[in-house]
From Swiss-Prot:
Zn(2+) 1 binds at residues 14, 16, 100, 248. This is Dihydroorotase. InterPro entries: Amidohydro-rel, DHOdimr, Dihydroorotase_CS, Metal_Hydrolase. GO terms for biological process: 'de novo' pyrimidine nucleobase biosynthetic process; 'de novo' UMP biosynthetic process. GO terms for cellular component: cytosol. The gene is pyrC. Catalyzes the reversible cyclization of carbamoyl aspartate to dihydroorotate. Coiled coil: none annotated. GO terms for molecular function: dihydroorotase activity; zinc ion binding. It comes from Cupriavidus necator (strain ATCC 17699 / DSM 428 / KCTC 22496 / NCIMB 10442 / H16 / Stanier 337). The active site is at 248. Its EC number is 3.5.2.3. Substrate binds at residues 16-18, 42, 137, 220, 252, 264. It is an enzyme of class 3 (hydrolase). Disulfide bonds: none annotated.
Length: 344
């Protein structure tokens, strides 16, 4: 049984850092484990221009504690009005590494998102020419579609036609949650990748309802059946370079999670690599963790691998039940419970 594992320092290819006091509270957790992260643009107001991305990047770097090295990889928020000129400026900036597609209303702060993908074709064609990846929240928002089916329907209604029209557009299918998505990415032609969260590798939808409503397991896309979780694990440990680490760590104040209409999102930045190690260990595939966490993402994005290392040791420790979050607190996923791995 492996007791200690040292890997190339990993990256997080899907992260929510928020802004202001919340940013200052959560950024150190990510920077202690990850060298780089793709930063989601769904602030209020959203990050829709290169100038806004540059300003947000400066705020992130200003909040980084002394002694920690971390590079934020910025993204733009795609809207119906995003121009080809803004895409060209994003590519030329050197610090914008993708453009995020949120179907309007699909998740937290997505109200300004895309209402019809066809309205974005001029911008998407510019992205295809520039080699700038499209990062996709892959769920339809049609209220007639069951929430557990929205990812699979998105593949048929949006992803397949989009990739038929733009076969060379680099696409990341973010935080995939279904067997359908895993098989789509595995079998697709052209430049397609996918991020997978730790919580979707570890849990199925029963976790939300064990002994009552468990709001800290509620995220979007929502956890799915066990057959889907098993398919995600199989994809993550397969060795395919198309699958890579993206925590989708999404901090919310405790009172906004434990609420009559609670926010979606799991906070995992503090203990992300410990959770991934647990998932890969359970699958008997610790030897596949480094490629998933440290190699596949940089290869897809055309970036060099990191030069530092991170060590994981088999060691029991208790995760704090709650963490400071501005003038309030947040509850990490599995808060107050014992974890079996420790990152150093």
């Amino acid at each position: 049984m492996t007791q200690k594992l040292t890997i190339t320092r990993p990256d997080d290819w899907h992260l929510h850092l928020r802004d202001g006091a919340a940013l200052a509270a959560v950024l150190p957790d990510t920077a202690r484990q990850f060298a780089r992260a793709i930063i989601m643009p769904n602030l209020k107001p959203p990050v829709t221009t290169v100038a806004q991305a540059q300003a947000y990047r400066a705020r992130i770097l200003a909040a980084l504690p002394a002694g920690l090295q971390f590079e934020p990889l910025m993204t733009l928020y795609l809207t119906d009005n995003t121009t080809a000129e803004e895409i060209a400026a994003a590519k030329a900036s050197g610090f914008v590494h993708g453009v995020k597609l949120y179907p309007a209303g699909a998740t937290t702060n997505s109200d300004a998102g895309v209402t019809d993908i066809r309205r974005c074709y001029p911008a998407l064609e510019a992205m295809q020419r520039a080699g700038l990846p499209l990062l996709v929240h892959g769920e339809v928002t049609d209220p007639s579609i069951d929430i557990f089916d929205r990812e699979a329907v998105f593949i048929d209604r949006v992803m397949t036609p989009l990739r038929r029209d733009m076969p060379e557009l680099k696409v990341v299918f973010e935080h995939i949650t279904t067997k359908d998505a895993a098989e789509y990415v595995r079998d697709a032609s052209g430049p397609v990748g996918a991020t997978i969260t730790a919580h979707h590798l570890l849990y199925n939808r029963n976790a939300i309802f064990t002994g009552g409503i468990r709001p800290h397991y509620y995220c979007l896309p929502v956890l799915k059946r066990e057959t889907h979780r098993e398919a995600l694990v199989a994809a993550a440990v397969s060795g395919s370079p198309r699958f890579f680490l993206g925590t989708d760590s999404a901090p919310h104040a405790r009172g906004l999670k434990e609420h009559a209409c609670g926010c979606a999102g799991c906070y995992t930045a503090l203990h992300a690599m410990e959770l991934y190690a647990e998932a890969f260990d359970a699958a008997g595939a610790l030897d596949k963790l480094e490629a998933f966490a440290s190699f596949n993402g940089p290869a897809f994005y055309g970036l060099p691998r990191n030069t530092g290392t991170l060590t994981l040791e088999r060691e029991d420790w208790e995760l704090p039940a709650e963490l400071p979050y501005g003038d309030t607190t947040l509850v990490p996923l599995r808060g107050g419970e014992t974890l079996r791995w420790k990152a150093r």
